[in-house]
């Protein structure tokens, strides 16, 4: 008998996470490493676990994640979004609870491009009147 996985894709900034969940003992593996090893900062680990803690499913699923692109913060957000979508795929009843917490909505904020003639996206060169 094949093990059935529930799948969710999460995105944040330029990071993309592919998340597979199956009933298990609560192991979270990101790119072949345990979550505590992959995310060096405590905030990253906390962000990843938020949907599970909120729905009371911490320790009930084995989660396998492939994440590419972006930095540590963007990847943590992408994994959270992916776990949220995978949980909804597992049980649609969780959707309203997750939406109320703001985990279902994709954070659309992206880095603004640098403009010609400016130092950064909006920072201009210092102007001297005299």
Curated annotation (Swiss-Prot):
<keyword id="KW-0687">Ribonucleoprotein</keyword>
<keyword id="KW-0689">Ribosomal protein</keyword>
<dbReference type="InterPro" id="IPR023035">
    <property type="entry name" value="Ribosomal_uS9_bac/plastid"/>
</dbReference>
<dbReference type="InterPro" id="IPR020574">
    <property type="entry name" value="Ribosomal_uS9_CS"/>
</dbReference>
<dbReference type="GO" id="GO:0022627">
    <property type="term" value="C:cytosolic small ribosomal subunit"/>
</dbReference>
<protein>
    <recommendedName>
        <fullName>Small ribosomal subunit protein uS9</fullName>
    </recommendedName>
</protein>
<dbReference type="GO" id="GO:0006412">
    <property type="term" value="P:translation"/>
</dbReference>
<dbReference type="GO" id="GO:0003723">
    <property type="term" value="F:RNA binding"/>
</dbReference>
<dbReference type="InterPro" id="IPR020568">
    <property type="entry name" value="Ribosomal_Su5_D2-typ_SF"/>
</dbReference>
<dbReference type="GO" id="GO:0003735">
    <property type="term" value="F:structural constituent of ribosome"/>
</dbReference>
<dbReference type="InterPro" id="IPR000754">
    <property type="entry name" value="Ribosomal_uS9"/>
</dbReference>
<dbReference type="Pfam" id="PF00380">
    <property type="entry name" value="Ribosomal_S9"/>
</dbReference>
<comment type="similarity">
    <text>Belongs to the universal ribosomal protein uS9 family.</text>
</comment>
<dbReference type="InterPro" id="IPR014721">
    <property type="entry name" value="Ribsml_uS5_D2-typ_fold_subgr"/>
</dbReference>
